């Protein structure tokens, strides 16, 4: 029968399909009512015997109708569930697409942000050209207003820069910094020397902060003078905006000599878990602390906080001897060969370190030196044996230089800078000449530094660069504070733990 046919699923209300379905259902209902009237007339005119059959037929029809309705409901429910599943799938697909787009946009934003951050860091260190090139070469530059605005700002700042007179670049230096004044100034025979030529960490930090606030910026002497492959020297260029003043920084004897053990100084330079340069310091109970206890890590931390204290990544110059090794590592061959004239400090140290390995010491020292160079630090010879080059013979200078090149150069990658020990110089003459200069020049040295109390002393000649340095130590702060006024106020810096009067020289 027609009414037994499964009905099609009900469309969603409000749609054209629903209206068509509704008309169809009304027409079918009308036809069904007509049939039911006809059937009732037949049933009334039939004999009683057929009544039972009619009732039976009605019951059967009723059951079939219920079955059809049930099937219709099931079909509608299945269709509805199918539509729901399809809608959920479409929603999930759309959500996934949106997530991909969002993640892509976030990734692009991160990359763009990283590029801007790198450019800003370069600009803070006065490397405007490199910052501008970095942004202009970025694929997003054409559509990034932030990048274009940054380039405009860098170009405007660069336009304010002027070339600093190279003959007016000052050079300051320190020795190893005192961490514990109670040990350095404990009244023994070494106190006077420490008081004269050393600086405390507290003094150093105050000086650094004051110089930064005055606009001083660390530069490399290799920014001041350039060397070609033939050893010829030409003037460099230092471009700084108004209010900034360049200076060169150096530190002598960064070897952590045996005689300083137990006197309140760091014992070596090491790398921490992040690869940053730190110091080791031996506490009273023999335990070892790792921290920022000397110039190298203190300057590194300061530049991390104040990038504009460094000109294009420059740090300072670390001057090394070699007879006790370098950077706190016992890297000299004498620790292994143990000649008959080995000094008492080395003998004692070797007795306390029976597991000594020259190869391990050199490997560790080179690792630290490489990390320092990566941060912008430069190395210099301080002569292997801390020699007074103005007084020793040419033969002694040659022998000493050979030891330095054999024991130190391989660990630091070589150097063409020599910082003379004892503050001396090759000669007192106006210009370098003579056998000692020719020998050192032939050994590859192009940059020469002595000690000079004047504010500036710079010579740039065809074959060498020469610069005087100013000692920022107890002696200078106590006796000649007026010579330091361009840098800081000595009275505000002077450590109250330092014994006074500071012993005079000589």
Residue ranges and their predicted role:
Residues 167-187, 231-232, 240-247, 254-426:
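Metal-dependent polysaccharide deacetylase catalytic core of the NodB/CE4 family, i.e.
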């Amino acid at each position: 029968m027609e009414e037994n046919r499964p009905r099609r699923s009900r469309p969603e209300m409000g749609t054209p399909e629903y209206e068509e379905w509704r008309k169809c259902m009304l027409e079918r209902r009308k036809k069904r009512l007509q049939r039911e009237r006809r059937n009732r007339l037949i049933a009334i005119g039939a004999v009683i015997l057929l009544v039972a059959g009619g009732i039976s037929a009605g019951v059967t029809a009723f059951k079939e109708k219920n079955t059809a309705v049930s099937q219709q409901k099931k079909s509608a429910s299945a269709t509805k569930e199918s539509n729901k599943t399809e809608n959920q799938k479409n929603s999930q697909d759309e959500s996934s697409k949106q997530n991909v787009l969002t993640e892509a946009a976030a990734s692009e934003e991160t990359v763009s942000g990283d590029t801007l951050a790198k450019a800003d860091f370069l600009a803070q260190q006065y490397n405007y050209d490199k910052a501008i090139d970095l942004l202009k070469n970025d694929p997003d530059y054409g559509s990034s207003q932030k990048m274009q605005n940054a380039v405009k700002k860098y170009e405007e700042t660069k336009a304010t820069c002027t070339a600093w007179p190279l003959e007016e670049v000052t050079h300051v230096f320190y020795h190893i910094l005192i961490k514990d004044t109670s040990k350095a100034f404990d009244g023994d025979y070494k106190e006077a020397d420490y008081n004269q030529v050393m600086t405390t960490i507290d003094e150093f930090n105050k000086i650094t902060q004051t110089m930064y606030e005055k606009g001083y910026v660390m530069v490399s002497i290799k920014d001041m003078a350039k060397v070609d492959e033939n050893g010829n020297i030409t003037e460099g260029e230092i471009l700084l905006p108004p209010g900034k003043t360049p200076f060169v920084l150096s530190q002598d004897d960064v070897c952590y000599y045996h005689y300083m053990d137990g006197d309140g100084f760091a014992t070596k330079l090491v790398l921490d878990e992040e690869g940053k340069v730190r110091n080791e310091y031996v506490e009273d109970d023999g335990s070892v602390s790792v921290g920022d206890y000397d110039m190298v890590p203190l300057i590194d931390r300061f530049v991390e906080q104040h990038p504009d204290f460094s000109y294009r990544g420059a740090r300072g110059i670390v001057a090394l001897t070699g007879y006790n090794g370098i950077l706190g590592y016992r890297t000299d061959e004498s620790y292994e060969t143990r000649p008959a004239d080995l000094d008492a400090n080395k003998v004692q140290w070797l007795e306390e370190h029976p597991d000594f390995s020259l190869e391990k010491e050199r490997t560790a020292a080179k690792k630290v030196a490489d990390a320092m160079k990566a941060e912008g630090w430069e190395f210099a010879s301080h002569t292997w044996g801390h020699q007074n080059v103005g007084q020793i013979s040419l033969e002694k200078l040659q022998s000493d230089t050979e030891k330095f090149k054999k024991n130190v150069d391989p660990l630091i990658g070589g150097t063409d800078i020599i910082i003379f020990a004892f503050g001396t110089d090759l000669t007192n003459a106006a210009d370098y000449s003579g056998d000692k200069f020719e020998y050192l020049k032939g050994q590859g040295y192009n940059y020469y530094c002595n000690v000079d109390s004047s504010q500036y002393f710079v010579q740039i000649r065809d074959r060498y660069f020469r610069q005087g340095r100013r000692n920022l130590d107890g002696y200078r702060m106590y006796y000649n504070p007026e010579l330091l006024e361009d840098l800081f106020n000595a009275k505000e810096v002077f450590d109250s733990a330092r014994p006074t009067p500071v012993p005079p020289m000589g």
